[in-house]
Amino acid sequence: MATYELVTRAGVEAEVARQTARFETREKNFGFKPGEHYYSPVTYTWPDFYNGANSKWAKFLEFGNTLGIVILNRSSGDWLSKRPDIDFATQGSMALSAGARRVSFYIKTRHGAMFEGMPVSYRDKIATNLNVDLSAITPFTEDFIIESARAVKNDYPNIPVNIFLDETNPWIEMSLQDKIIEAYVRLYNRLKRELGNDCLIIINPGSNTPASMMAACDVVLSYESNAAKYLDPGTQWIHPEHYKGFPSWRFWHVIHGATPENIDEVFAKADSLGIGHLYVTDRTFKVGGGSEDEPEENPYDKPPSAWVENRVKAWIGGTLPFEKRLSALEAKIKELEAKRNV
């Protein structure tokens, strides 16, 4: 007599993750190593190499060969109106010369709202969620994304092409989730055929994903929010169990709003989760009276403060635990000296 087992969605996701990790088909790790730390900043700032010592990009590139991924973002992913843009060609080449392992080109996807088979109601929902007009949604079809990717490959021959796909959240409309993930896997395969298997494809849902969406990317930016939420014990599913079978270099966390009081805890949390790529900044995000495209407070319009960069260097170099003890000792000495002088 046949027996049947009731399998939950969570159980299915866990099994998908186990099998996918076991039969990993990627032949290379794109220059990254499991367990290593990579500083992968969100470099949405315009190329400004001509500003010399005041260049924002120069601050990022000071990290040299500890840089993992940097992002070239021309007007929120507009690669078709000016071909090529010499400023971006120059800045990308400078990033490679500085030691960045991968330079990626930013392209919006608007959460797949214009992908094949998506209903009009989903497009409307995305426009509402992003607080933008529908005209800011409709251009972003799968074919438009492929055309944009093809353009950067042709126009920037001195920069090996890698693609950063923004706005890829699969949780916005649960009734369409499987269809959305299927569309992103299809897009991933199309990009690989168009650009080659050496092209690193990053997706940015800004949150965790079902295990099945790991087939739609090489690296997933699976957390993009503030430090307080990152450290809150009540925040669940930052790095769910179904991610555990994948190497650390496939995950990227972006944490804004860090403070001197919590930044070391942020690094410790990332290490406990096994996150390879990290960007931490003290700058803050607030939509306010703006939109997702043009927020009132933008954490990516400037590099982090110098004190953040110093802590990042300690995290990369593996000296952060020692520096934490040293800082605590210095604070204790100051406290004792203050008492002695009373």
Predicted regions and their residues:
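Sec-dependent, cleavable N-terminal signal peptides
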Residues: 1-2
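Glycan-processing catalytic domains of CAZymes
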Residues: 8-321
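Alpha-helical coiled-coil heptad-register detector
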Residues: 321-324, 328, 335
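Helical coiled-coil/dimerization "stalks"
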Residues: 331-342
